[in-house]
Amino acid sequence: MESFAPTRKGRAVFSADAAATAAPGSAGAGETLDPAKDALIIVPVRGFVLFPGIVMPVVLNGPAAIAAAQEAVRQQRSVGILMQRESGAEEASPLNMHRFGVVANILRYITAQDGGHHLICQGEQRFHVEEFLRERPYLAARVKRIEEPDERSPDIEARFVHLQGQASEALQLLPQTPPELIAAVNSAPSPGALTDLVAAYMDASPAQKQDILETIDLRARMDMVAKLLAQRIEVLRLSQEIGRQTKASLDERQREMLLREQMASIQRQLGEGDGKAQEIAELTEAIAKAKMPAEVEEAARKELRRLERMPDASAEYGMIRTYIDWLIELPWSLPEEAPIDIAEARRILDADHFGLDKIKQRIVEYLAVRKLAPQGKAPILCFVGPPGVGKTSLGQSIARAMGRKFVRVSLGGVHDEAEIRGHRRTYVGALPGNIIQAIRKAGARNCVMMLDEIDKMGASAHGDPGSAMLEVLDPEQNSTFRDNYLAVPFDLSRVVFIATANMLDTVPGPLRDRMEIIALTGYTDREKLEIARRYLVRRQLEANGLKPDQVEIDDDALIEIIRGYTREAGVRNLEREIGRVLRHVAVRIADGSASHVHVSRAELTELLGQQRFEDEVAMRLSVPGVATGLAWTPVGGDILFIEATRAPGHGKLTLTGQLGEVMRESVQAALSLIKSRAAELGVDPESFDKTDIHVHVPAGATPKDGPSAGVAMFIALVSILTGRLVRNDTAMTGEISLRGLVLPVGGIKEKVVAAARAGLTRVLLPARNRRDYDEIPQDTREKLEFVWLEKVDDAMAAAFEGMAATPAPN
């Protein structure tokens, strides 16, 4: 059967008479139901319950509801308003319909201009569905109509009076209650009618209203409505109380503002008290403009009220004023962030730093992630490396690339937790901690904060600042960081934290676990030369008031400064020495003795004095018992001389040079290995009991430790016991085992760079360190010959290659 379609569009009202005169062949007209069989046309509704005696608009959803309503209008019949069990169901079917509904008369059928269909219905009587007779094109069912009981017993009357009182109270609590509704409640003809009236207009869920409709017993129904109405009255009372309090608060604030204005006007006329009143007014305005969170603003206004009541001469007046100033001046709101330009970030990093390709690539990756996920929790980078390699300047470059403010917090020597969290205001001279002070200095809540020298914090009786830093660097906690001085939470989650350290040994494990470690190694001589050309000379020219056309420094002179006057992993001393050279030049130009100065290698002795570092390798390796090891230090790699000598004695082993426990064990392991191979090496096994051996590692004032010198110890001992010289162009590193294996060690890049810097041409490295070969700079690889060691036999073959045996000195 086709669905009903009106023949005239835009018609707003269908009456029963008009529908009756519709064309008999209209689509949707089905066979007429027999009223005698209690057959009822069902209009399905969603999320709506109609009660007997109530006139309500009914929204027609879906073709079944529209067809049912139009057929009922055509036949001039009542309909059954029945709610669907699932309001989200598209099609009405017997399976998703409730079984209790209300018989209703259609007072009006409305077709709106937007195409919607509505009925104005008046509920008449409850019914129960006994059987659905049809499903398409509309629902029809055989129903049992339920008569409303007319009881007037005392308990019913008592409930009636109670419910009527509740309804009147609820209507009084509601704003703008229609008078007709009040009159309907007061003139309800019966307890059942009152109950249905209250249920219809009560703020309850459709499910609760359906339960009321299905409750046939009048007492139970009245109790159910009374209970729900009592809950609603309580909600209305609370809402009204909250509204009164809010209005009272606003009225009090307006009254206070008016009184203050009047007081200020009187004071201005008298010429008294202008200063403090103006100060309070300025602070009030500043608090309003600071865009503080509600909790912080409440704390600020509370302190402002205390300040207003306090005499100016009070000692506490200045403390409160300082506290309010801190709250006002902190950046509580988040500024707009410019998008990160990755290409511009690369340009900035390349312009500010030479080399460091892998470090810069990691920073670019970090910035790319920040760009794509600005709300994400980015890792906290920690740059670890020797002094002067550019850790702090990398942080400044990151800030420039992100377009953010940069601020630096020095943690070196901090040993008090209050330096991080601040002092409580009860102490004289209390201030916030370094973190909050840095935020205020930056003036932005999304700044880049450099935590410099994080490895140099120390615990004391005043607490452990390292533990306080755990909260600062934890993305899960720092959004509510609470400084002891402020005593209110401050959001640090948008701060980009970057830490620096020279070494990780002194950084607590939990703190180290919160950071991503990025190691910066020392520069090669070629890299230092390029850095001097591009940055250091230019910076020192500007610092000393010189112009580029007044001074020219040869590359040979710069190389000589690098090798003879500075021996460091970074370039800090190199810049200092270049500054010394240019100050000498500035004197010549300032006194008029020269207008252009050319600095060559030959002039360095005159300008800087004698070289501070000399090549001692050849001299030290001129006797047996001396081997050159390679060491890693916090300031980069270095060469390490191992000296051994022997003398008649009783088999005593002496170790000097401030050797650590691991290094001492390396010497003992090397000597035990030699004893086990004495026959192979040509050493008399009985000579060990008649010989005292002394191993020394200069410089004696510097503590040394680690397993890296095992190979060098072994070669030095073999050299002194066999009288063979070690090649003077060879350095070595590696740990040894009692089986004669050479084990891998760390710091290969720094050690190899140190060997090249010292003028050596061969390095002996553990074969299992081949994976570190790619980390070595290309220019350093080109200068050196690499020998890879599996066993100590490989080390002896390479160290003694081409060297003759000479009598070992006694």
From Swiss-Prot:
Keywords: ATP-binding, Cytoplasm, Hydrolase, Nucleotide-binding, Protease, Serine protease, Stress response
Primary site of residence: cytoplasm
GO biological process: cellular response to heat; protein quality control for misfolded or incompletely synthesized proteins
Gene Ontology CC: cytoplasm
Active site, renumbered: 708, 751
InterPro entries: AAA+_ATPase, ATPase_AAA_core, Lon_bac, Lon_bac/euk-typ, Lon_lid, Lon_proteolytic, Lon_Prtase, Lon_prtase_N
Root EC class: hydrolase
GO molecular function, one term: serine-type endopeptidase activity
Enzyme Commission number(s): 3.4.21.53
UniProt key word Nucleotide-binding: yes
Role played: ATP-dependent serine protease that mediates the selective degradation of mutant and abnormal proteins as well as certain short-lived regulatory proteins. Required for cellular homeostasis and for survival from DNA damage and developmental changes induced by stress. Degrades polypeptides processively to yield small peptide fragments that are 5 to 10 amino acids long. Binds to DNA in a double-stranded, site-specific manner.
Stated name of the protein: Lon protease
Origin species: Methylocella silvestris (strain DSM 15510 / CIP 108128 / LMG 27833 / NCIMB 13906 / BL2)
